[in-house]
């Protein structure tokens, strides 16, 4: 009896698989969300200023934010410095 059920199950699975391949899958396009956070507003303002700088001239001077900027602490100075004792023991 079990041997007779196996071909029937295989045929049902084959028909189901064929049906799944034949039906097109609807693709939902992802809508761009509007963001109301301060970070997003800042990024949008920065993008606007960058795009409009070609027409209006340089609005913002470039800032030096690289790894070798003035005022950056070197790790050698930090390691050689004495620890601060805020709490007396």
Swiss-Prot record:
Molecular functions per Gene Ontology: hormone activity; receptor ligand activity
Keywords, ordered alphabetically: Amidation, Amyloid, Cleavage on pair of basic residues, Disulfide bond, Hormone, Secreted, Signal
InterPro entries per record: Calcitonin-like, Calcitonin/adrenomedullin, Calcitonin_CS, Calcitonin_peptide-like, IAPP
Any single GO BP term: amylin receptor signaling pathway
Superkingdom, taxonomy of origin: Eukaryota
Localization: Secreted
Disulfide bonds: 35-40
Leader sequence residues: 1-22
Classification via PANTHER family: CALCITONIN-RELATED, ISLET AMYLOID POLYPEPTIDE
Domain remarks in the Swiss-Prot or TrEMBL record: The mature protein is largely unstructured in the absence of a cognate ligand, and has a strong tendency to form fibrillar aggregates.
Summary of subunit composition and partner proteins: Can form homodimers. Interacts with IDE and INS. Interaction with INS inhibits homodimerization and fibril formation.
Name of the molecule in the record: Islet amyloid polypeptide
């Amino acid at each position: 009896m079990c041997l007779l059920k196996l071909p029937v199950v295989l045929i049902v699975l084959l028909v189901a698989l064929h049906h799944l391949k034949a039906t097109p899958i609807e693709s939902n396009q992802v809508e761009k969300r509007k963001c109301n956070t301060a970070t997003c507003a800042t990024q949008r303002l920065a993008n606007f200023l960058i795009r409009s700088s070609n027409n209006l001239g340089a609005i913002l001077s470039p800032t030096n934010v690289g790894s070798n900027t003035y005022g950056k602490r070197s790790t050698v100075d930090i390691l050689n410095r004495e620890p601060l004792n805020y709490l007396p023991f």
